Design a protein with these regions (language model features):
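GG-anchored amphipathic helix commonly corresponding to the ABC/SMC/Rad50 NBD signature/C-loop
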Residues: 1-14, 24-31, 35-36
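Short loop immediately C-terminal to the Walker-B catalytic DE motif
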Residues: 18-19
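C-terminal lobe/lid and adjacent interdomain/linker elements of RecA-like ASCE P-loop ATPase modules
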Residues: 24-44, 49-99
């Protein structure tokens, strides 16, 4: 879908493109985005996906505080929560679901 809609040397504004994409498709999207960036395209993306946030060299801006700030990938809540969940699934779910 993305490959057919995007063209070289354009500016793309995307709001949560991961919403309907599996993790595998998000990786495919990263490859398409990379190829287009190499052709001169630029992307401004609002996302919660740690996969899309991982794009090398991306400027990640956080709107969580009073001021907009650039943050490192590993400092994002999306990365930290996903990493913690994947590394500690059982204890995470036990704490979350404990009544």
């Amino acid at each position: 879908m993305f490959a057919n809609r995007f063209q070289d040397s354009a500016l793309y504004l995307l709001d949560e493109p991961e919403a309907a994409l599996s993790p595998q498709r998000q990786l495919t999207f990263l490859k398409i985005m990379h190829d287009l960036a190499n052709e001169g395209s630029q992307f401004i993306i609002a996302t919660h996906s740690p996969i899309i946030l991982s794009y090398p060299g991306a400027a990640i801006l956080s709107f969580d505080g009073e001021e907009i700030q650039e943050v490192d990938y590993e400092a994002t809540d999306h990365y930290q929560i996903t990493k913690y969940f994947l590394n500690n699934r059982e204890s995470f779910l036990n704490k979350l679901l404990d009544d």
